[in-house]
């Protein structure tokens, strides 16, 4: 499928209709879904109706936005009015939200065509999309491997050309890690830049919604459509949203790029990053080594803070108001216990237990409070780094995509796949992953580019210059 601008040009020139584009995406989904399993719900009727509305506007001579008629996938933890939103959990089986999330509302107003709700790790808890209660998504580059997580469905759908762009959410790497594993572009914006209203909460101080695409330009276009203040979200920032595409320039002259020394290794992923640094330097960037001493402590701090917030956020699912409820419970307490025991998967239960333990009276200071102090130190490390450089880079992940089932019995090994991405969430910074090479098995590596608060412009500029100087993003999986 073509880029957003290419499809927009075809629409305004009446070379293709929005309905034809939507039908092509839906046909691709129908063909690939038996093996890929990216989507939990395909919204064919809605997609055709939205596409017809775009065609009617074009026929009437109205101007349309860049996103009008563009097929998009929506992660299934974003509320969509009248369309099931399950968070890939049995406990929300059959739940149909009575309201629309801010981001999906903004995309609908822009004329985007939603083709379906994408698979994820249950309640966005996981790094492989194997924790879904309904199906396991495959990696388009190798169907025996995971697409990453928790937004694996969105990443796989974009990589497989089932949609042009998609939305995901990122709490500790859930956009960037699957973007790296699937060889696409994924951006976690600054915390508060994109409204979380209608995003089913996992860890509220870390969650952020962002775009997946196959190019940096498409990422910039989608970010511009979903960013901006929202009075319905108390953490939403009151900032002007620029046209992010204006920052996409091929030269990096004057840009200072910091390499996080704690992420430099001789591993294949480290070597892919070193090759990328040579490209950045050739584009005019000044490369510096920058130490973030507490970088590695982001992982253990995160696995106290995020489960603690999750234990509170997930307490609302009790079988009373919506979703799954056990039959013939003897008492109210019995109904609560059995509903949650049957409705939640094993990883969600593990996080709830960790969080409840960390918040308990005897351990609060030793765990939760200490983790928050570590989070502050990590943020201070980044502040010191950005006093010297414009952007920071690291590998997105320590390895390429692993085999399905390889890490499910070893949670710690699974958690380590987010080692590079988690600190960015802890500090509330923007971070982007884009393809920077392939391993011997033909699996993609990701380069992570991190910016200072609200400096998405510099992140996108650096990513675009690198992308245009290389051809990694042009490779496609053979499906």
Swiss-Prot record:
The keyword NAD does not apply. Coiled coil: none annotated. GO terms for molecular function: ATP binding; glutaminyl-tRNA synthase (glutamine-hydrolyzing) activity. It catalyses: L-glutamyl-tRNA(Gln) + L-glutamine + ATP + H2O = L-glutaminyl-tRNA(Gln) + L-glutamate + ADP + phosphate + H(+). One of its GO terms (biological process) is translation. The active site is at 75 (charge relay system), 150 (charge relay system), 174 (acyl-ester intermediate). Its EC number is 6.3.5.7. It is an enzyme of class 6 (ligase). The keyword Cytoplasm does not apply. Keywords: ATP-binding, Ligase, Nucleotide-binding, Protein biosynthesis. It holds the Pfam family Amidase. One of its GO terms (cellular component) is glutamyl-tRNA(Gln) amidotransferase complex. InterPro entries: Amidase (IPR000120), Amidase_CS (IPR020556), Amidase_dom (IPR023631), AS_sf (IPR036928), GatA (IPR004412). Allows the formation of correctly charged Gln-tRNA(Gln) through the transamidation of misacylated Glu-tRNA(Gln) in organisms which lack glutaminyl-tRNA synthetase. The reaction takes place in the presence of glutamine and ATP through an activated gamma-phospho-Glu-tRNA(Gln). Belongs to the amidase family. GatA subfamily. Heterotrimer of A, B and C subunits. This is Glutamyl-tRNA(Gln) amidotransferase subunit A. The gene is gatA.
């Amino acid at each position: 499928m073509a880029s957003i601008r290419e499809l927009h040009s075809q629409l305004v020139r009446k070379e293709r209709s929005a309905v034809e584009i939507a039908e092509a995406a839906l046909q691709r989904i129908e063909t690939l879904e038996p093996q890929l399993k990216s989507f939990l719900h395909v919204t064919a009727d809605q997609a055709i109706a939205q596409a017809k509305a775009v065609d009617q506007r074009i026929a009437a001579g109205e101007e349309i936005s860049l996103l009008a008629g563009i097929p998009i996938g929506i992660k299934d933890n974003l509320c969509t009015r009248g369309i099931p939103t399950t968070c890939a959990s049995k406990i929300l089986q059959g739940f149909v939200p009575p309201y629309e999330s801010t981001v999906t509302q903004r995309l609908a107003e822009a004329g985007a065509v939603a083709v379906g709700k994408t698979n994820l790790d249950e309640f966005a808890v996981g790094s492989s999309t194997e924790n879904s209660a309904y199906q396991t998504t495959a990696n388009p580059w190798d169907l025996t491997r995971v697409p990453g997580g928790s937004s694996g469905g969105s990443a796989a759908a974009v990589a497989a050309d089932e949609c042009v762009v998609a939305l995901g959410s990122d709490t500790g790497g859930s956009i960037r890690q699957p973007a790296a594993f699937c060889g696409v572009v994924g951006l976690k914006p600054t915390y508060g830049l994109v409204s979380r209203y209608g995003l089913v909460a996992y860890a509220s101080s870390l969650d952020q919604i962002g775009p997946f695409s196959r190019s940096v330009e498409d990422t910039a276009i989608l970010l511009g459509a979903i960013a901006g203040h929202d009075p319905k979200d108390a953490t939403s920032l009151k900032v002007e949203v620029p046209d992010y595409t204006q920052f996409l320039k091929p030269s990096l002259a004057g840009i200072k790029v910091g390499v996080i020394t704690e992420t430099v290794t001789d591993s294949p992923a480290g070597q892919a990053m070193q090759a990328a640094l040579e490209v950045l330097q050739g584009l005019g960037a000044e490369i510096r080594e920058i130490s973030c001493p507490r970088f590695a402590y982001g992982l253990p701090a995160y696995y106290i803070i995020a489960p603690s917030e999750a234990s509170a956020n997930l307490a609302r699912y009790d079988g009373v108001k919506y979703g799954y409820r056990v039959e013939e419970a003897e008492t109210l307490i019995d109904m609560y216990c059995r509903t949650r025991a049957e409705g939640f998967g094993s990883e969600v239960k593990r996080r709830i237990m960790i969080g409840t333990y960390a918040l308990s009276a005897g351990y609060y200071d030793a765990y939760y409070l200490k983790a928050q102090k570590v989070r502050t130190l990590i943020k201070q490390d980044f502040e010191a780094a950005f006093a010297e450089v414009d952007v920071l880079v690291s590998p997105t992940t320590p390895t390429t995509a692993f085999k399905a089932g390889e890490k499910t019995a070893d949670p710690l090994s699974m958690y380590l796949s987010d080692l590079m991405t988690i600190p960015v969430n802890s500090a509330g910074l923007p971070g982007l992953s884009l393809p920077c090479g392939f391993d011997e098995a033909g699996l993609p590596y990701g380069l992570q580019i991190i910016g200072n608060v609200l400096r998405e412009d510099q992140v996108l500029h650096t990513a675009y210059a690198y992308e245009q100087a290389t051809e990694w993003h042009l490779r496609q999986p053979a499906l």
